[in-house]
Amino acid sequence: MNGIERIGEYFLLMGRVFRLPDRWRMFWRQMSKEMEKQGLQSILITLIVSVFMGAIMTLQTKLNTENPLLPAYSTGLVTRDCILLEFSSTILCLLLAGKVGSNIASEIGTMRITEQIDAMEIMGVNSANYLILPKIVAFMVMMPLLVTLSMFMGLLGGYGISAITHVLPISEYLLGIQYAFIPFYVWYSFIKTVIFAFVIASMASYYGYYARGGALEVGKASTKAVVNSSIVILLLDVVLTNLMLN
């Protein structure tokens, strides 16, 4: 199957997904489970990566911008903008594409090869809507919360490395993360995150839904979901940055 056929198949699947659920109670129940699985179970890795990346950004920025012409607070300013504009949205989504995306693809793919999806279709259930819609909506709801947590922990990581290593006075770091703050950067990050969350969940669901064969094919589908969604995220990042910040 060539790329154009895959794109068409993807949009046809999304047409089946985005329909009103037959049973709203079941939808909310499934969505709450997915929010826990995709969001709450991703908090720990988000905390760890964000703290260390914030610390590394602060350390690298300070050590590589030793210039008497640059004010000391510029390190905090650069760290803040890097975290708000790219790390907590794009890089975190790339990270979670591997965790959440592969999980979604393997879960749906396993249901496909064990003929559970076929059984749903025989019973007249819209399997695409029942299985995929709660996953997409749940991830789009949880990602902005994870991004907010990532922003806070990233800035906290920079504060921590400043306090521990004394590479930068804490007062200068705090001044830097407050200096010339642009609130739109936060909204820009949230908008990107919601779009990226949709890409991750929908593409992972697509590759899992159309998996064929056995366990090996499910593994290949998971790999394709992660790789291709990561590529699409990077392409969209360029487009959205040009549209929203240019």
What are the functions of these language-model segments?
Residues 1-29, 207, 212:
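Short, membrane-interfacial amphipathic segments enriched in basic
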Residues 39, 43, 47, 87, ...:
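Selective transmembrane-helix segments that form parts of the transport pathway or gating/packing helices
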Residues 60-84, 152-194, 202-221, 244-246:
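Membrane-interfacial helix-loop-helix connectors in multipass membrane proteins
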Residues 49-52, 96, 133-162, 195, ...:
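Hydrophobic alpha-helical transmembrane segments that constitute the membrane-spanning cores
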Residues 38-91, 95:
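Active-site cofactor/substrate anionic-group-binding motifs, chiefly glycine-
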Residues 218, 224-241:
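Final/C-terminal transmembrane alpha-helix of multipass membrane proteins
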Residues 110-132, 215-218:
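Short cytoplasmic-facing helical segments at TM-TM junctions of multi-pass membrane proteins
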Residues 75-118, 203:
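Hydrophobic alpha-helical transmembrane segments of multi-pass membrane transport proteins
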